[in-house]
Amino acid sequence: MSDTFNAVLPAEWAPQSGIQLTWPHAGTDWAHMLTEVQVCFAAIAREITQRELLLIVTPEPEEVKKQISATVNMQNVRFMECETNDTWARDHGAITMLDSEGASLLDFMFNGWGLKFASDKDNLITRQAVKVGFLNGRYVNRLGFVLEGGSIES
């Protein structure tokens, strides 16, 4: 077996199959300004769906549909109903690595910025998204390793 790891972390500008947003709700740290933040997320969703697929992770898909359906290209939206602690997909989402066999979806531990905030629900999102087919690739469990806040560089 070789010690060489021949995989790449795709650049930010590389072609992608879509974008994930984890939607703000009353149980997130946005509660004090929820309406304002949801309007901002709706504007982000509108821009994304003009160009590519969007996966919205939310415990309230019907509520989010009401918020965005008038302004967003709903043909490019997929909803995954899932309990969440917060909105930071960069912290709890999969990290995709590409090799000769295709995509590997690395699922790292998010610990809520050093256990400052709950993150137990967020740590289930990637695994569920792969299980139900919203994310395609080989699931790689790395939940024993804390990696959050965009704390990697390629």
Task: List each model region and its residues.
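The feature marks the mature, well-folded catalytic cores of soluble enzymes
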Residues: M1-S154
